[in-house]
Design a protein with these regions (language model features):
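ATP-dependent carboxylate/acyl-activation modules
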Residues: 120, 329-331, 453-461
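Active-site beta-alpha connecting loops in nucleotide-dependent enzymes
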Residues: 58-61, 327-328, 346-421, 470
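Short acidic-hydrophobic, aromatic-tinged amphipathic segments that line or gate anion-handling sites
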Residues: 93-97, 423-432
């Protein structure tokens, strides 16, 4: 058979190579000769011989600037938006849109395998829910998951490129900034089940209204097969208004709503974890325990349980497997340093997740409570109200001292002060460290939460170095 030959991705773990016509597998990315590729990378530091390097033009860094170096280091082909100096023309594949090309490659590669896959989206709780899904699915077989929160046009393909013949289950997190992005990702991943955790105000800046956010999250339906379960939070004020396609099976989870298909009752939460009972209309009642604090994490666990059981996995084993959940990064991570309890929740923030995190702090008995809360980004017109409400929630949580960090947090500080909370408003990291040194003492509990761009993770690490060890 003569060319054209398609640029196809085959990791080393794959034991077979399937010939598929170029127009079926990857229209537009054809080469003059057949080739097998062992990796697809977007970071020039990860280039190895036999890989494909995909150039992404970014705001701060343009991947095209690293293409020649990638080729010199052994990249078999370069996917670029234009010819690149230092890379032979016959080793360059020109595409108008790198993201679309990568999505196409990943989509068609994914079709070589048939794992049971859960797709997760929502305004808040995506990554925690994804990790609960991973804990449950891993009890049944080899499971692939999205690493960190790599949930965009680059992260989802990178996850799918890690599929191999031994993968039995997978969970893929899908994020978005604009309408249409979830549809693109779900059509690429083709999950067997979908989860929408909740609809909040994250990305309101780009989408305008919560109703538009709901529409964008519901795009996950377009990649689900007929009869697939779509798992939704019945306690969220907006999700029950969603127009779920009749070809899908809606599965509602919650705590407050008695009509939930999967409901948690008798919830008891503390710093050592949370226990509850799962009442499942289809499979019965089960005891469950999770190593996380806060009622909001029960919702994430319920979503994972509901999705896994509706994929046919044993309900009792699914409930038990929730206990094997492990935190990732600084997400609801409780640690003790220098006699101080720190609730690290620094990766991202929205009004909904702020309120949930403050509820964890509120539940801690017999301790002085300090909240280090920073700016919440991408809230658009809801920003001032969101920060103001957070200040009010801090007061309701019994916060003794609030350190508000960032320009948007001025409204938070003002609201907390008005409700009697001792409050300082910091404009930079050094001011924050100064007040942490001044306020924090052994026996205290400190909640740290803000949008990732505020840099609280590094700030905490710097502060930890100043605390007594052991």
């Amino acid at each position: 058979m003569c060319g054209p030959y398609v640029l196809t991705y085959y990791p080393k773990e794959v034991l077979f190579m399937q010939k598929i016509p170029a127009n079926e597998l990857l229209a537009g990315l054809t080469l003059a000769e057949p080739v097998s590729i062992h990796a697809v990378v977007t970071d020039s530091r990860e280039v190895k011989p036999g890989c494909v390097f995909v150039c992404f033009p970014g705001e701060r860094v343009d991947g095209h600037d690293f293409a020649a170096g990638a080729y010199q280091n052994g990249a078999a082909y370069i996917i670029a938006n234009h010819p690149v100096e230092g890379v032979p023309a016959d080793r360059t594949v020109i595409v108008p849109d790198s993201a679309k090309a990568m999505i196409r490659m990943a989509s068609n590669y994914r079709m070589l395998f048939n794992p049971k896959m859960i797709g997760v989206t929502g305004s808040v709780g995506k990554t925690t829910t994804k990790e609960f899904c991973y804990a449950v699915l891993s009890a049944f077989g080899k499971t692939l998951k999205t690493e960190g929160n790599q949930n965009n046009d680059i992260g989802v393909p990178n996850t799918l490129f890690r599929l191999d013949n031994d993968t039995e289950y997978a969970v893929v997190e899908m994020g978005m900034d604009h309408a249409g992005e979830i549809e693109r990702l779900t059509r690429c991943a083709r999950p067997s089940a979908g989860i929408i955790t909740m609809i909040g105000v994250s990305h309101l800046e780009n989408l305008g209204t919560r109703e538009n956010i709901l529409k964008a999250k519901m795009e996950i339906c377009t990649g689900l097969p007929d009869g697939a379960p779509l798992v939704l939070n019945v306690d969220n004020d907006l999700l029950p208004t969603a127009d779920v396609p009749t070809r899908l099976k809606a599965v509602w989870f919650g705590i407050d709503a008695e009509n939930a298909d999967v409901r948690a009752v008798d919830v008891e939460t503390g710093t050592n974890g949370t226990t509850f009972k799962i009442i499942d209309k289809e499979y019965g009642t089960f005891d469950a325990a999770i190593p996380t604090a806060g009622v909001h994490t029960v919702y994430d666990a319920l979503a994972a349980y509901a999705a896994a059981t509706r994929l046919g996995l044993d309900a009792a084993r699914c409930a038990a497997a929730l206990a094997t959940y492990q935190t990732t990064g600084m997400r609801q991570h409780i640690v003790k340093k220098g006699g101080v309890t720190f609730i690290e929740d620094c990766y991202n923030a929205s009004p909904d997740s702020m309120r949930a995190a403050l509820s964890v702090l509120k539940a801690l008995p017999n301790t002085r409570k300090i909240a280090l809360l920073g700016d919440m980004l991408e809230l658009g017109d809801a920003s001032e109200d969101g920060h103001r409400h957070t200040g009010e929630w801090a007061a309701d949580a019994g916060v003794d001292q609030l350190i508000a960090y960032g320009p948007r947090s001025a409204a938070m500080a003002d609201a907390a002060k008005a409700h009697g909370v001792v409050t300082v408003h910091c404009k930079n990291a050094e001011e924050v460290l100064q007040y942490l040194r001044q306020f924090v003492r052994p026996g205290d509990a400190v909640l740290a939460k803000a949008s990732h761009a505020m840099g609280l993770e590094q700030l905490l690490q710097d502060f930890y170095k100043e605390l007594p060890q052991g």
